[in-house]
Amino acid sequence: MTSPKATAPDVTASDVTVGARARILCISGPNLQLLGTREPDVYGRDTLADIHARLEQRARALGVEVDARQSNHEGTIVDWIGDAPREGVAGILINPGAYTHTSIAILDAVRATGLPCVEVHLSNPDAREAFRRRSYVAKACVARVAGFGADSYDLGLDGLVRVLARRSGAS
């Protein structure tokens, strides 16, 4: 038995409209600056810069803007999330890295914004060690995309843009 190739339907700006160039905050958490060299058998060979460049291309195709950031520091991530509404952010795409399994502070920050948030992971945490199977952050998210490697970011963005379009009544 072969496994089906997982692909999302192609989404274009004509399929989804979210108003005046919605701004998406993309946050990548601890150790993700090491992508490309850190456990490539688990996380792939794409660097975070590669992922961000593709995400920006995808965002342009969807008619949105992405502000992609990375930090190893929980407090910085919490500050970015907390500032998001005042900065005109419409939604959040987040790969909390190891904070997925530990950070009630990030969970609370996402909840406090009231913004739609999609959690993304390169690997599938549910297929890994038991301690990786709990996500505190996902409890505040509209969806979770995992296990598609670097494509998880693009798939998460596609989903988030669809959520924003539905909420604006434009889809």
PLM regions: where:
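Intrinsically disordered, low-complexity terminal tails and inter-domain linkers enriched
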Residues: 1-20, 169-170
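Glycine- and acidic-residue-enriched helix-capping/strand-helix junction motifs
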Residues: 35-50
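Short, glycine-/small-residue-rich phosphate/pyrophosphate-handling segment
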Residues: 68, 118, 127-171
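Short glycine-rich anion-binding loops that position phosphate/pyrophosphate groups of nucleotides
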Residues: 30-32, 97-100, 123-125
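Short beta-strand elements in bilobed, periplasmic/extracellular small-molecule ligand-binding domains
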Residues: 51-52, 56-69
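N-terminal small/polar loop signature for handling phosphorylated ligands or for N-terminal nucleophile
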Residues: 70-94, 98-114
